[in-house]
């Protein structure tokens, strides 16, 4: 499974996972602005934030099935477009209810990234590489957590939370295009028959 495509593929999926962590953490950072904008209590803010987690959790089994039937390229591209739509709607949300719906869309949209990425990386990297590449994926996701803390606070203070999320929505649209352009479900040399080692890893939950 040697290909010049696999590292660009990995980095696109890794940035996708970075965005997952960013969206997971960001409401806590912009909480004061959201409370002021929508005139809500801390409890209501928790409801708004939880919309992401509920939709994310509910979709884990469906996205696994879709990754098998559609493939990672189609699945992650489609769901990223949904996440981008959610971020853009959140940025222009006129009411608390609208903002909550937008957060549900974001959670729905980013739910496919991790499962689909593990599946595809198992096919593109050897068994000896898989543990290392999975760890690197998680590490890049951690950068998303960091970027949604202090850096996000500075950006929000400079441009406002609405402009910040408009930017995130736009960035997600670009990322969807990159995913479609770069990601391939199966390495070229395995397009007719998957290797026995890759199939074994998939059947054992992605373990090398």
Model-predicted regions and their roles:
Residues 21, 25, 107-115, 146:
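Small-residue-rich segments within alpha-helical transmembrane domains of MFS-like 12-TM solute carriers
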Residues 58-97:
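Conserved MFS/SLC helix-loop-helix module at the cytosolic interface between two early adjacent transmembrane helices
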Residues 137-185:
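Helix-loop-helix hairpin linking two adjacent transmembrane segments in secondary transporters
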